[in-house]
């Protein structure tokens, strides 16, 4: 456990020594701070100079990582050891993008051979749709693709397809359906022509309630309009491991793409779950996405901790969570294409590390994953940055931006990028009472009025942030960015001694929903309901009589 590691008391002592120090003083005394706390990897760079740390902090954090045998645990994951201890599974999302030739054997299975076999089938299918060779039941080309999934079967593909829209096939439109609220599926179907629509149903078991409900609604809509169930074979494909259920649905087994239990949903966009990505962007761009992630994997495995991006970000996060007692972390991308990135990271981070039980089954006496949230930074400035600047919470921020200007939008990117740098500087530097008072006097306010108002114009500063810069939003850079956050999450899970690869927390609500659904549908359930739940069930039933 973290609190039992030999470096932990050293970090506690160090925290007491520097907790009142201000970053603006460090910057004024150390002209090399920005260059020393800057790491470049391929087309991605991290400026972590605006954090409440110094060389001693970093030295102790790296020592903490070594106390946890982080290097050995990284190697264990890549080798396919069953580090998902509660489910007795390997964790091999990295194998999905591996360019190595050294085979990984898992329970007599050749992992890379299996992965590449599925990728080959995905490429052939993608090519057939993009080229127009695969036609619908009236011999029309496919123009619209609807991905039906939820959680990891939705968020990753949605995020990547949105981020890389500039690389998409000009004929194809992507639609994502995840919410079991019928409004979403009906709104999507309303726009579509069944003769030119391809549905991808993504569910490992092919029994996920939300996904199957939406898929059956899509199936009913399609059959009613096409006039014959046999046409399903040309318009529905599945990403699943349940061949029998897929065939019962009407999908040809040759149009089923498998994935494996060594890949968790939130880590699965690199697998057949990414079929929608490959069709939309093409195999060349999908390969570049995989390669970018692979290069980050190699960096994570091989770079020393001192220049290792996932290690640095993971340890800096631990520093705030476990010593500054920060409860929250903000993801602020300054790019319209990255608008779904915060909610993707929400799932990745909170579903992985939102745990309170150690790998040994003991209750953990310290904080783990913070609440992760975010929005596009430029919009957020006009919404909740007020709280970040002058509120009572310490909320570390990841600013994410690209250097590449958008064509045909002169001046826009300079304004956008200036705000990234200005906000990060403002959070670090702040504004003193004396500065605020002087500004108000210079604007002509009376001295007494300026004295009172100046209190409201003070920015304490010392608010930490990372700045992640991509040269441009490209397939390879997106691959590297996602893999960076995957590995950051892994680092923190190791430090906290938790299993980052199960998600038992999603199960209880699903179990309890079963008897409630029976009651709502007019069937009697033997389940016991608390008085509040019972009252609300009756309220619903009475309204819908």
Curated annotation (Swiss-Prot):
- Entry's Gene Ontology BP terms: gluconeogenesis; glucose 6-phosphate metabolic process; glycolytic process
Which family is annotated?
Belongs to the GPI family.
- EC numbers listed for it are 5.3.1.9
What does this protein do, in the record's words?
Catalyzes the reversible isomerization of glucose-6-phosphate to fructose-6-phosphate.
Q: What is its main location?
A: cytoplasm
* Active site, per annotation: 351 (proton donor), 382, 510
The superkingdom of the source organism is Bacteria
Location in the cell reads: Cytoplasm
- Keyword Mitochondrion found: no
According to its UniProt record, this protein's enzyme class is isomerase
InterPro entries the record matches = G6P_Isomerase, G6P_Isomerase_C, Phosphoglucose_isomerase_CS, SIS_dom_sf, SIS_PGI_1, SIS_PGI_2
| GO CC term (a single one) | cytosol
Please identify the protein, giving its name as recorded: Glucose-6-phosphate isomerase
Catalytic activity from the UniProt record: alpha-D-glucose 6-phosphate = beta-D-fructose 6-phosphate
């Amino acid at each position: 456990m973290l609190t039992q590691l030999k470096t932990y008391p050293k970090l506690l002592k160090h925290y007491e020594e520097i907790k009142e120090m201000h970053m603006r003083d460090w910057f004024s005394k150390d002209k090399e701070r920005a260059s020393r706390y800057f790491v470049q990897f391929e087309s991605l760079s991290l400026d972590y100079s605006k954090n409440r740390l110094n060389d001693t902090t970093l030295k102790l954090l790296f020592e903490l990582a070594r106390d946890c045998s982080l290097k050995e645990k990284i190697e264990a994951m890549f080798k396919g050891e069953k580090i998902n201890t509660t489910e007795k599974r390997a964790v091999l999302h990295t194998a999905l993008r591996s360019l190595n030739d050294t085979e990984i054997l898992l329970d007599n299975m050749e992992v890379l051979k299996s992965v590449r076999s599925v990728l080959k089938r995905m490429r052939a299918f993608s090519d057939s749709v993009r080229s127009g060779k695969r036609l619908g039941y009236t011999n029309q080309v496919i123009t619209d693709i609807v991905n039906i999934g939820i959680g990891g079967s939705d968020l990753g593909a949605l995020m990547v397809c949105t981020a890389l829209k500039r690389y998409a096939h000009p004929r194809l439109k992507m639609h994502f359906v995840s919410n079991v609220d019928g409004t979403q599926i009906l709104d999507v179907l309303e726009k579509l022509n069944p003769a030119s629509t391809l549905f991808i149903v993504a569910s490992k078991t092919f029994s996920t309630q939300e996904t199957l409900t939406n898929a059956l609604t899509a199936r009913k809509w399609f059959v009613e309009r096409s006039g014959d169930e046999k046409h399903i074979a040309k318009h529905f494909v599945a990403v699943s491991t349940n061949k029998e259920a897929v065939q019962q649905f009407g999908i040809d087994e040759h149009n089923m793409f498998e994935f494996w239990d060594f890949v968790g949903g939130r880590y699965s966009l690199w697998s057949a779950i990414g079929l929608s990505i490959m069709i939309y962007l093409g195999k060349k761009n999908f390969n570049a996405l995989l390669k970018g992630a692979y290069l980050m994997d190699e960096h994570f495995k091989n770079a020393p901790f001192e220049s290792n991006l996932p290690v640095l970000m993971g340890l800096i996060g631990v520093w705030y969570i476990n010593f500054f007692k920060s409860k929250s972390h903000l993801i602020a991308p300054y790019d319209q294409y990255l608008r779904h990135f915060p909610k993707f990271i929400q799932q990745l981070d909170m579903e992985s590390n939102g745990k309170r039980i150690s790998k040994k089954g003991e209750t953990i006496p310290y904080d783990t994953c913070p609440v992760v949230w975010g929005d596009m930074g430029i919009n957020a400035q006009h919404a909740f940055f007020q709280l970040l600047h002058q509120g009572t919470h310490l909320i570390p921020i990841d600013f994410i931006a690209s250097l590449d200007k958008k064509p045909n939008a002169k001046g826009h990117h300079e304004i956008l990028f200036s705000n990234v740098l200005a906000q990060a500087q403002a959070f670090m530097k702040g504004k003193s009472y004396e500065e605020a008072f002087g500004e108000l006097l210079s604007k002509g306010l009376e001295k007494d009025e300026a004295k009172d108002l100046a209190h409201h114009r003070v920015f304490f500063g010392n608010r930490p942030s990372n700045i992640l810069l991509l040269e441009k939003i490209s397939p390879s850079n997106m691959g590297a960015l996602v893999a960076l956050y995957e590995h950051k999450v892994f680092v923190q899970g190791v430090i906290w001694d938790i299993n980052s690869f199960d998600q038992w927390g999603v199960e209880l609500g699903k179990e309890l929903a079963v008897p409630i659904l029976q009651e709502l549908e007019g069937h009697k359930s033997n389940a016991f309901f608390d008085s509040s739940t019972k009252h609300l069930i009756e309220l619903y039933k009475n309204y819908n009589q």
